[in-house]
Amino acid sequence: MAVPKFKKSRANTRARRSQWKADNVELQTQKINGQEVQIPRRLVKAAQLGLIDLD
């Protein structure tokens, strides 16, 4: 397991952690069962197969 050789300052630790941000998911417009819905790309196939509820 990797172990740090030197102590990191609080400022450096927080600056490093601040780079970890969640990204916005891009929505795609799909026509499913005659209605247009905006869903994430990774859920398009599941929506077409009826595995998820789109109400």
From Swiss-Prot:
HAMAP family: Ribosomal_bL32 (MF_00340). Residues 1-22 are annotated as: Disordered. Residues 1-19 have a biased composition (Basic residues). InterPro entries: Ribosomal_bL32, Ribosomal_zn-bd. SUPFAM superfamilies: Zn-binding ribosomal proteins. This is Large ribosomal subunit protein bL32. One of its GO terms (molecular function) is structural constituent of ribosome. Coiled coil: none annotated. Keywords: Ribonucleoprotein, Ribosomal protein. Pfam families: Ribosomal_L32p. GO terms for biological process: translation. Belongs to the bacterial ribosomal protein bL32 family. GO terms for cellular component: large ribosomal subunit. It comes from the Bacteria.
